[in-house]
């Protein structure tokens, strides 16, 4: 559940930024200090009708983001392309989706570490095979 998505104390959260990614490919980065509030529960993002959060991560040393859709498209781009927004904002589109396609998985790369290897179409797939593109493009459908 997303209630456990940020197992980090508030003092530490103030030092970091948090990324939100939804199934309709909306995303934003929010300064962790935005969540330093007196209330126990706080709305962390606005969602469009029918949208839901796919990933919430604390950004520490991640470099690139890789989006994978239900229809098998992948898009890799720099986290620097995602603007920092206020917690009440909807965010920006990360990837152009067609039809009923939606973001299913989110992966991150880190400097000096190998890109993740995932199971895709029942085979091992090295995400380093995905070329870096630009935010708000369609992505590619790799052959496995």
Model region roles, listed by residue range:
Residues 1, 5-144:
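C-terminal interaction appendages of subunits in large macromolecular complexes
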